[in-house]
Amino acid sequence: MKDSLRAVWRWVRWPLYILAVGYVLLVLYDVQRLFDIDKTNEAVAAIHAQKITLADVQGTNLPPIPDQAENDATIEGIDKNNNGIRDDVELAIFKKYPSDKKARGAALQYASAEQMYLTKVFNTETWKAVAEETGRAGLCILETETEIDWENIQELVANTQLRKETRTKNFEFITSHGSAGENPCDTAVN
């Protein structure tokens, strides 16, 4: 009887070991997936929370002219005033719209959304959140009733080969989406 139990155990233990190891691997995978979901949810919330302010539109915290070599060395570039818009892009928008605050606000909002394609997208959900914010910014541009060259803003934001490649690569996450469902403009400027 003892010998027959040992013989059965010899044949049964390996499948049991394999099942136990498989279960542990599955649990580890699921824990990692839950962390990824939390990371995505936090990133999406941060994307939707990023707004330009009236101080940004008025130029209260206007940054100094950045060193171009240092600014172009990374995808993010330099953003000294931490408003989500690269300093060279922000200064170019102020130069193009010096007296029209409404147009400047819409252009800054659009530039901020375009910058997020480079810095905030890492999966389909984050791409969708950025696309919704870009759509809001586009509607804000339409509300200004001013001729705003949005293609020029895209070119300002993606002005190096690395930035162009990153933007193109991030469009691999493209998916359908709706609107953000809020007021299109971050600021109410008249």
Language-model-detected regions and their locations in the chain:
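Calcium-binding acidic motifs and repeat modules
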Residues: K2-N82, D88-N190
